[in-house]
């Protein structure tokens, strides 16, 4: 792996690779045009991925307050909930209310996870900016997650694409296809490069706007990140935008993010206080911590557009409703060093 100094230079050289410019991508009016895009784009997933696996229901008001604070910190994309049946994931029984509130924030793109075309139709009707659809590279994990084969889920993605295309051009949300267990599976073990590329190819052929590679159970290493990203780029071509969704299960989350930067990735998912995990992946717990990721990137000279002081305020909201054992983050323990220049 290249040194951090080299990575910093590489970040500037590859700045345009994989960036979306929001004025052309998201149709919902924004409060003000961006002066320039940040070097690295972070999607905050705590309101959805961070809460879905909790065995306690977080009050609707708290979810809305969390989203408010995240948006106020300058985060430009928020995964705000999932349009799934409440009996499957009770945490999102209030998704319609939460999503309506989230969409009042014009400075951020608001996205939602959907498991099928019915969920997509609800998300489209709600007016979301982005729809996230997951297919596992692992057949076993896909069956556990959505009770469908990989082939059946690919057909489901095509149906979602068709539902979006049926809307007027100005009312079509962006569609991201996420490949779960891209770097290993707690149910199957190793996941082959071919299995990941198969799903990536299906997403590209169905005209996904973006493809996400998810380290669902935190088994990735920096070397493996580079290998899989390179393989997927060969499969779908350099014009496809890729993002990484990393977990810190085994402590390699930030190292894997640096490997992603070296591989040309400029879009990452993360969760405040490291919330999250997959309810159908035994042993998986904890997305990479947004606060720690922002600090690292800014220290590397890569802008995120996020006000770290404001982002840290999310901990107070979470601590009122979520047990401390679920809340992590080095920056919360050590505090923000004076050397960090504000990203605001």
Language-model features: locations:
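Catalytic cores and adjacent flexible loops of soluble metabolic enzymes
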Residues: 20-344
């Amino acid at each position: 792996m290249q040194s951090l100094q080299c990575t910093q230079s590489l970040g500037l050289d590859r700045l345009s690779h994989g960036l979306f410019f929001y004025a052309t991508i998201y149709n919902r009016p924004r409060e003000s045009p961006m002066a320039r895009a940040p070097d690295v784009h972070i999607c905050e997933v705590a309101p959805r991925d961070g809460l879905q696996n909790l065995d306690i229901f977080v009050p609707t008001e708290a979810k809305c307050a969390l989203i408010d604070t995240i948006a106020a910190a300058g985060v430009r994309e928020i995964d705000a909930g999932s349009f799934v049946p409440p009996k499957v994931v009770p945490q999102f029984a209030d998704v319609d209310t939460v999503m309506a509130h989230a969409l009042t924030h014009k400075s951020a793109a608001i996205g939602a996870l959907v498991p099928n075309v019915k969920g997509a139709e609800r998300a489209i009707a709600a007016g979301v900016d982005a729809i996230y659809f997951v297919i596992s590279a692992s057949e076993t994990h896909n069956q556990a997650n959505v009770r469908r084969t990989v082939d059946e889920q690919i057909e489901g993605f095509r149906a979602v694409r068709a539902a979006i295309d049926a809307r007027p051009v100005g009312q079509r949300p962006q569609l991201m296809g996420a490949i779960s267990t891209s770097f290993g599976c707690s149910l199957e073990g190793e996941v082959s490069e071919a299995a990941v590329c198969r799903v990536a190819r299906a997403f590209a052929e169905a005209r996904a706007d973006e493809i996400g590679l998810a380290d669902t159970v935190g088994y990735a290493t920096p070397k493996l990140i580079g290998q899989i990203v390179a393989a997927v780029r060969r499969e779908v071509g350099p014009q496809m935008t890729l993002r990484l969704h990393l977990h810190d299960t085994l402590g390699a989350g930030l190292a894997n993010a640096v490997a992603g930067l070296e591989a040309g990735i400029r879009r990452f998912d993360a969760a405040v206080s490291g919330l999250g995990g997959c309810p159908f992946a035994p042993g998986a717990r904890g997305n990479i911590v947004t606060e720690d990721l922002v600090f690292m990137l800014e220290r590397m000279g890569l802008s995120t557009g996020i006000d770290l002081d404001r982002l840290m305020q999310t901990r107070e909201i979470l601590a009122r409703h979520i047990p401390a054992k679920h809340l992590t983050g080095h920056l919360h323990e050590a505090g923000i060093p004076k050397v960090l220049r504000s990203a605001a």
